[in-house]
Each structure stands twice: as C-alpha cells, then as structure tokens.
Amino acid sequence: MSVSVPTLDRIRNLEQLYRSGYRSATVDATIDKLLSVEVAKARQEADSLRSRLAELETEYGMSSADFLRRFQAGELGDSADMFEWSAYYQMWLSAQERVRLLEAQAV
C-alpha cells in the first residue's frame, strides 16, 4: 500500500505544528473521526475475509494457519483454490494488523 506524498507531507506538517505547541479541537475531532471510520472499514474487511476463510476451512478440514504452513511447505499442491486461500488469508492478516494499529490510536 503506497501513501500519497502530499498526504504524508500534510501529516508531517501537522505533526510539526503540534510538536511546537499548536492545538486545534477541530483537528483533534477530525482525526478521531477518521480513525473511527478507518477502524470500522478494516473490521468490515476482516469480517468479510474471515467468512470466506471459514468456508475454505470447512471445505478442506483445516485451519487457515495450518493450511498456510502446509501450502508454503509444498504439501497441498497448486490448485486455484490453494492460491485463492493463501491470498485471502494474507489479506485477512493484513486487515487484522490494520485494525490493531488503528485501534491503538483511536480514542
């Protein structure tokens, strides 16, 4: 995931202002709302991916963690389902990490 350079520059400028003593209730409220919205989006994505993973786990009779370990060891072949499962699991892990990071910053 790449970050827009202008966005990153704006965030750094706000950080610099805040470090120099600047305060704004509007900026604080906006950031709180932004984090809340992003947490909800990441949770929704994680939940949707989790549903698909549950289907695959039921179909193949193993957890996604066990699947990935076995898939990476070359024990499960290379069918389209296996690559799809791997992609869904990696996307779910990424979404979970986003939730964790965003929740740590949310008020």
Spans of model-derived segments:
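Heptad-repeat register of long alpha-helical coiled-coils used for dimerization/oligomerization
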Residues: 29, 36, 43, 72-75, ...
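Short, compact, well-ordered microdomains
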Residues: 78-104
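Small, basic N-terminal interaction modules of short regulatory proteins
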Residues: 1-58, 62, 97-107
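Short E/K-rich amphipathic alpha-helical oligomerization segments
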Residues: 54-76
